[in-house]
Design a protein with these regions (language model features):
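N-terminal Rossmann-like or analogous alpha/beta NTP/dinucleotide-binding catalytic cores
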Residues: 1-96, 110, 151, 251
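Structured secondary-structure scaffolds
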Residues: 1-26, 73, 78-82, 108, ...
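The −1 position to Zn-ligating cysteines in a subset of zinc-ribbon hairpins
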Residues: 89, 105, 112, 122, ...
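A short alpha-helix-loop-beta-strand transition element characteristic
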Residues: 96-100, 130-131
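Short metal-coordination and nucleic-acid-contact micro-motifs, chiefly zinc-binding Cys/His arrays
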Residues: 102, 119-120
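Cys/His-rich microdomains that often coordinate metals
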Residues: 113, 129-130
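Predominantly a Rossmann-like dinucleotide-binding segment in NAD(P)-dependent oxidoreductases
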Residues: 120-121, 135
Length: 258
């Protein structure tokens, strides 16, 4: 995280020197099962646990002189408000539906996998053990947007850089894009689904929405959305590329946003 944030900081400073009006948004992803489990192991609440981590991150940013225009926390009230509006809209228009998830789950990556996606029975992203999971869940119709995603990559050749990573995502889509699990009933540490509160939002829908919630989309706290969106650049680690280049643009397509 320090590596990626430092690279973003350098780019933000360079663009400011060129005269651009820059909005640099580092963030912390604070919900999910691994946070809940680690907090329990330490004997503190999940909120206390993430508050301590965030304090350390902010101290590190000061030490390294890393700038930020707005520090985003996914536990912030305005972000929760935005996520609930986004989830409700996607459900009401039919892009989110209720089903049952049965398969494999990697807790460190917070990712669900089918049998065919595992590598030697382990998570294809991190190589760790997975465990069997079965629960009622809501799903986002990612598969509905497969053709539009491929066309996006073709029409905007530099949408994903470097080229090798773009080719990975194209291959992933062409092997058959599955709908994405977007809620949990077994993880209370998350944003409640407003119309079905026994469910909490799965962490990726929550986390990805921060890019627009931090600009005021779906809330009254900020009003920078029209000025700064769409973003000129997302700088992300290779381990979360799939979520940012497949799930996130598919969500934006569903919302009718650029």
């Amino acid at each position: 995280h320090t590596y990626t944030t430092l690279a973003c900081h350098v780019l933000a400073r360079y663009k400011r020197m060129q005269g651009y009006d820059v909005m640099f948004l580092p963030a912390t992803d604070e919900h999910g099962q691994k946070i809940q489990d680690k907090a329990a192991a330490k004997g503190v609440t999940p909120q206390q646990y993430v508050d301590d981590i965030v304090a350390g991150i902010k101290d590190l940013w000061k030490l390294m002189n890393i700038s930020n225009d707005r520090f985003v926390r996914t536990t912030d009230a305005y972000h929760v408000q935005s996520c609930q509006k986004i989830f409700t809209q996607l459900y009401e228009q039919g892009d989110i539906y209720k089903g049952c998830y049965k398969g494999h789950y990697c807790k460190p990556c917070e990712s669900f996998w089918t049998d065919s996606q595992l590598v030697d029975g382990k998570c294809p992203d991190c190589g760790r053990e997975v465990y069997e999971a079965e629960e009622e869940a809501y799903f986002f119709k990612t598969s509905k947007y497969a053709d539009r995603l491929l066309k996006l990559y073709e029409d905007v050749p530099d949408f994903i850089q470097p080229e090798t990573r773009k080719n990975e995502m194209i291959a992933f889509i062409k092997q058959g894009l599955q709908d994405t699990c977007v809620s949990r009933t077994t993880v209370p540490w998350g944003i409640p689904v407003p119309f079905d509160p026994k469910h909490t939002m799965y962490v990726w829908v929550d986390a990805l929405s921060n890019y627009i919630s931090a600009l005021g989309y779906g809330n009254e706290t900020y009003d920078d959305y029209e000025k700064f969106w769409p973003a000129d650049i997302h700088m992300v680690g290779k381990e979360i590329l799939r979520f940012h280049t497949i799930l996130w643009p598919a969500m934006l397509m569903a919302l009718g946003l650029p």
